[in-house]
Amino acid sequence: MSRAKSPSPTGIPTQSIIWAAIGWATLALMFYLFLSAPTDGPHIIKPEECNKVVKDLIVRPNWYRYGTYLFQTVAITFSGILCLRNWRSPKIISGRNVWLGLGLGILSWGIGNLIFGYLDFQYQSGLIAGGAKGAANLVKTFPSIADIFFTATYVFLSWGMAMSVIGRRLNLYPKQWGVVGAVGFIGIGLAAYVTFGAGGGFTLDTGKILNIVYALGDIWLLIVATILLLAFWGGKAAQSWRLLGSAGIAMFFSDLWFNYSINISDICKAKPYQSGEPAEFFWILAFILWGMAAALEFDLSSRPTGRSRRG
């Protein structure tokens, strides 16, 4: 990455973008690791779905939750912009549709995340404000209108990641294809356990259908990410593709943990889902890696070729 010094159209050197991304990821990691403990409480609540009062509810403070959304939104915004910059540039040699899909997917996820965050704050605030008397007509965080954007995210990301491998001469050895198959099999097993095992069996309600859609999208991202890592393991010119693969894997694990947390939550036992889990850092990591990949690919594509240097 030491050669990535060419300036972007905004005048910011690519190397500065890379270091800023690494710095933001480091700050986010420390924020999640050291400040994520629930400290607000205990509260006494009476949710509608519970037969009795729930005591000793301890939640994460709002200032911490605001901080997590700040870290996520900044990473999403800059990564989405960098991906769309690649799509608009005629110099990109890697296929502009790759970056269009990634950019739209990232920004769609960001919109859905902000909507989900608003609903999550409304739900928890109303629940605590209701106290032992109970709170009625609370907003639902899942499923909600935010899932429209999350579903669109999987469509765009799956398309963008697919474009990164379709039409390319991958030249994987049989053993490498075996690794891809094994990773896919493990991913299917993990997703099935989270969706159906921890999720309470097979049903066809809206929430379960969405979980299945998300699981399928995550499995696809994991498989494509594995292919990219195996096919583009060496060489500086392949750095952006390795970062794309790493981002897909980070997205898989963060989504898997989110679905698991939702499925095992039980508000009646004072164990509700709470945003701000340390595992959410992998969302930020995924978006940062996508943004770094976009910056490196733009830098590589903007360099003069040997022919042009010879005049």
Q: Which residues does each predicted region cover?
A:
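Polytopic alpha-helical membrane-helix bundles and their juxtamembrane interface segments
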Residues: 2-311
